[in-house]
Amino acid sequence: MAGERRDSKAAAFFCLAWALCLALPGFPQHVGGREDRADWTQEKYSHRPTILNATSILQVTSQTNVNRMWQNDLHPILIERYPGSPGSYAVRQHIKHRLQGLQAGWLVEEDTFQSHTPYGYRTFSNIISTLNPLAKRHLVVACHYDSKYFLPQLDGKVFVGATDSAVPCAMMLELARSLDRQLSFLKQSSLPPKADLSLKLIFFDGEEAFVRWSPSDSLYGSRSLAQKMASTPHPPGARNTNQIQGIDLFVLLDLIGARNPVFPVYFLNTARWFGRLEAIEQSLHDLGLLNNYSSERQYFRSNLRRYPVEDDHIPFLRRGVPILHLIPSPFPRVWHTMEDNEENLDKPTIDNISKILQVFVLEYLNLG
């Protein structure tokens, strides 16, 4: 995550975010004293999760394996991978290979484009993995897979961005792998509402600034993809709706992997979904499923509010997409340093948050 902590801009950005939150239709609209019948693009605002019981939670968490994730997915991503680098290509191929090998039958696409940077034109490639492209509505879980570009160091070290965002990438791949059976069932369902709701995983390229964070030097992948989705009819052949309107909720993971993270609420219009994360965390703790965990160091805290942070959700937020931003506050101490590496990751924390996220996704998709 490359967004600098620019306090001078925080208040102005908060006003923008607040205005957008208020503009989002959280309740059915009334005209002339009667309630208009909401179309499918409005269903996200009344969507309800299927709360998993203890038996289901135990089954879900038994399917995930942090050690396997560490070896099979995290290690291949913990390399220098700034846009256009050999490492970027290698990580992109790894992500696609892992998703294409699952039984659920993901549609895995590369969104490749060129954009001007402080170093001239560069090629970027987002990865979009869609469980059921024919579904009208999609829960989106996203992160960025690029690492920040640093000039060659005298000691030969390279920036691998372990929390930023190798770990979120690995967590998303582990989510797809461990929930493969349930997601296969969801894709095969032909009856509403399951047939109309699916999952999309997005791995953004070019989140980081090459030189200094600015509107033109940052968020290359998300800016391009949001614009593309806004101009792409959805469902296919539609005349009045597009892929942006097909996003139910945009869950963005960033800077995850350090010990004792604290996630505050950034957007009030999605606070009810943040509350589900908090409740799931408590349920897992009550069931003894969180490792090296103390309730005094709770991860998700709905009583904490923070100004929004600039990240890959911004181009989608500006187009009215509901955002759930999972980025800790404060940032990890190793942020944007060569110390953001495997040595400074905390495996129990990653395992715990991964379990919480997997339960959340199943609940949202009504796969309880």
Curated annotation (Swiss-Prot):
Q: What's in the GO CC field?
A: extracellular region
User: Where does this one sit in the cell?
Assistant: Secreted
Molecular functions per Gene Ontology: glutaminyl-peptide cyclotransferase activity; zinc ion binding
Query: Which lineage ranks, top first, belong to the organism behind this chain?
Result: Eukaryota, Metazoa, Chordata, Craniata, Vertebrata
Q: What is its EC number?
A: 2.3.2.5
Entry comment describing in which tissues the protein is expressed: Expressed by the venom gland.
Q: What's the protein name?
A: Glutaminyl-peptide cyclotransferase
Please list the residues annotated as glycosylated: N53, N292, N352
The UniProt annotation places Zn(2+) binding at D164, E208, H336
User: Keywords of this protein's UniProt record, alphabetized?
Assistant: Acyltransferase, Disulfide bond, Glycoprotein, Metal-binding, Secreted, Signal, Transferase, Zinc
Q: Which family does it belong to?
A: Belongs to the glutaminyl-peptide cyclotransferase family.
The active site annotation covers: E207 (proton acceptor), D254 (proton acceptor)
Q: Give GO BP annotations, semicolon-separated.
A: peptidyl-pyroglutamic acid biosynthetic process, using glutaminyl-peptide cyclotransferase
